[in-house]
A protein has these predicted regions:
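Short, acidic, metal-binding catalytic loop of nucleotide-sugar glycosyltransferases
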Residues: 22-32
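Active-site-proximal specificity loops/subdomain of glycosyltransferases
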Residues: 44-86
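Short beta-strand-to-loop acidic/aromatic patch adjacent to the donor-nucleotide binding site
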Residues: 84-97
Length: 274
């Protein structure tokens, strides 16, 4: 049995999804099983590697986005009795790109070396965080904006809703549809439950935004600028309603409190603090 379940999220971009699938199968096929979630894709635009096709009227109209999509995939693994077979889950949007070579082997090495890391993200060459990873290639952070997370199963089990695994609340809060601030909430849950969130430069990843810029109509979403405005506006309303926070800064400070407390309990990891 492979150690990792990789979940790829696709909406009407089969060629893009298949390239990523084949990259992972080529370089990491001995470590991962790959599952493709179709987020309301048109039948003629399904990937040939499709595992599950979410095709309710609402999903066909709006898609799933990252949070609901990953909830869907993880919930399916639970319902099919496969969830407990894996050590970790690699959650990817199909516009994620990696360098030629293995991705999961070095990430799993980091996860094995850092026993309290529950969330691990490869670094991006566009991130300022890369400047903090010269001497120590892996550091623990209180903010990681990414569409490529490797999650330890023990962490997921500590914070997920195993009693009612579904698209709206298994791991991510599905009421935050586009996901602005969702990474804050997930990382806060990690540190509040004695798990760390880390970025590593052992693997590099990037998001190919050209698909949203050039194929918004095919994906059936708003154009890049409109999508960004709605993403922020919806997320700020969600933060206000759920937490009473009026700004992104307040949410960050909320997470930072749990982050600092983690190192009070685990001073042996202080070398990984930023």
């Amino acid at each position: 049995m492979n150690r990792v379940a990789t979940i790829l999220l696709n909406r009407n971009l089969p060629d893009v999804t298949e390239r990523l699938y084949e990259h992972l199968a080529r370089f990491d096929g001995d470590l991962t099983d790959i599952f493709v979630v179709e987020a309301g894709s048109d039948v003629e635009l399904l990937s040939r590697y499709t595992t599950w096709h979410a095709n309710s009227d609402e999903v066909v109209r709006r898609g799933l986005r990252y949070g609901r999509g990953m909830n869907y995939g993880l919930s399916q693994l639970v319902k099919e009795g496969k969830f407990g077979e894996y050590d970790a889950f690699f959650l990817l949007t199909n516009d994620t790109e990696f360098n030629e070579g293995p991705t999961l082997a070095p990430l799993l090495k980091v996860l094995d070396d850092h026993g309290r890391v529950g969330i691990l993200a490869p670094c991006s060459e566009r991130w300022g965080e890369r400047l903090l990873l010269h001497r120590e290639p892996t550091k623990y952070f209180w903010f990681i904006h990414n569409n490529a997370y490797l999650l330890r199963r023990a962490f997921v089990e500590a914070v997920c809703d195993m009693e009612e695994p579904d698209v709206m609340g298994f791991l991510f809060d599905g009421t935050n549809f586009r996901g602005y601030g969702a990474e804050h909430e997930l990382i806060a849950k990690a540190y509040a439950n004695d798990w760390a969130a880390a970025i590593t430069s052992q693997v590099w990843a990037r998001e190919n935004e050209s698909h949203l810029l050039e194929k918004a109509d095919q994906i059936k979403t708003e154009g890049y600028e409109d999508n960004l405005k709605i993403y922020v506006a919806e997320g700020r309303r969600w933060m206000r309603k759920k937490y009473g926070f009026n700004s992104h800064w307040s949410m960050q400070q909320y997470v930072k409190c749990f982050y600092d407390r983690f190192f009070e309990y685990y001073p042996e990891f202080s070398q990984y603090k930023v």
